[in-house]
């Protein structure tokens, strides 16, 4: 187990999460007592207690007053906020994880973008205008692409779509930095934003789903061509 955290709390959190992932603390089992666990990890009980509360909020654990702390099946109890953690824990699963992320984005975007264009065209125009002044760099495009999809999600009038994008943000932008290092990916994105603006101005709302799905296929093809060289630190938080 290689843990890179720099603070005692960060170390304790990574230790427990990796122990759950590696089945040292399997789902359904009971976490060791606070005193035993704090000595095992090498942190104070106060620090450990704070970490356990945070992990419980993220769905890794269930803290029961007067009862031992239970390990959850995190696939059933956690939210989108653990995606980065999962990618960091198992680099070999990253391509499949990102494939799933892109499929979800395409499927929901086809719905919320059409709704946004139909019901909030002025806001859509404002969102798409961001693409007119973007720097031609991977970093800039990663942030732009996230902002465009998130902006269109909220422009749909259904904030749940926006909250989903919020949950994807960390991994989305980290993957985007790698994906948009390919000039063809940046060119494809600019063309896609331009096509959406054309559909908005011409009120061709019924074509939105086909355009979004076509973009999903084309961007997916570029992504698949880049998968073999995915950086091992793609899910690492920049310090």
Curated annotation (Swiss-Prot):
GO terms for biological process: fatty acid metabolic process; regulation of fatty acid metabolic process. Residues 34-53 bind DNA. It is found in: Cytoplasm. One of its GO terms (molecular function) is DNA-binding transcription factor activity. Keywords: Activator, Cytoplasm, DNA-binding, Fatty acid metabolism, Lipid metabolism, Repressor, Transcription, Transcription regulation. One of its GO terms (cellular component) is cytoplasm. The keyword Iron-sulfur does not apply. Residues 6-74 form the HTH gntR-type domain. It comes from the Bacteria. It holds the Pfam family GntR. InterPro entries: FA-response_TF_FadR (IPR014178), FadR_C (IPR028374), TF_FadR/GntR_C (IPR008920), Tscrpt_reg_HTH_GntR (IPR000524), WH-like_DNA-bd_sf (IPR036388), WH_DNA-bd_sf (IPR036390). The keyword Lipid metabolism applies. Homodimer. PANTHER family: FATTY ACID METABOLISM REGULATOR PROTEIN, TRANSCRIPTIONAL REGULATOR, GNTR FAMILY. Multifunctional regulator of fatty acid metabolism. This is Fatty acid metabolism regulator protein. It comes from Pectobacterium carotovorum subsp. carotovorum (strain PC1).
């Amino acid at each position: 187990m290689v843990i890179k955290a720099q603070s005692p709390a960060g170390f304790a959190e990574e230790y427990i999460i990796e122990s759950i992932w590696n089945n040292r603390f399997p789902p359904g089992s009971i976490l060791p007592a606070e005193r035993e666990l704090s000595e095992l990890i090498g942190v104070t009980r106060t620090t450990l207690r704070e970490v356990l509360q945070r992990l419980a909020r993220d769905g890794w654990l269930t803290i029961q007053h007067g009862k031992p702390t239970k390990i959850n099946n995190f696939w059933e109890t956690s939210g989108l906020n653990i995606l980065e953690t999962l990618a960091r824990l198992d680099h070999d699963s990253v391509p499949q994880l990102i494939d799933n992320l892109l499929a979800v984005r395409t499927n929901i975007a086809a719905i919320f973008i059409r709704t946004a264009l139909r019901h909030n065209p002025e806001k859509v125009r404002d969102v798409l205008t961001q693409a007119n002044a973007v720097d031609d760099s991977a970093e800039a495009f990663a942030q732009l692409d996230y902002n465009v999809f998130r902006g269109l999600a909220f422009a749909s009038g259904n904030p749940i779509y926006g909250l989903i994008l919020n949950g994807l943000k960390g991994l989305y932008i980290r993957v985007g930095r790698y994906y948009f290092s390919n000039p063809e990916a940046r060119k494809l994105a600019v063309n896609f934003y331009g096509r959406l603006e054309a559909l908005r101005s011409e009120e061709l709302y019924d074509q939105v789903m086909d355009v979004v799905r076509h973009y999903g296929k084309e961007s997916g093809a570029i992504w698949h061509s880049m998968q073999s060289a995915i950086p091992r630190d793609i899910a690492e938080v920049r310090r």
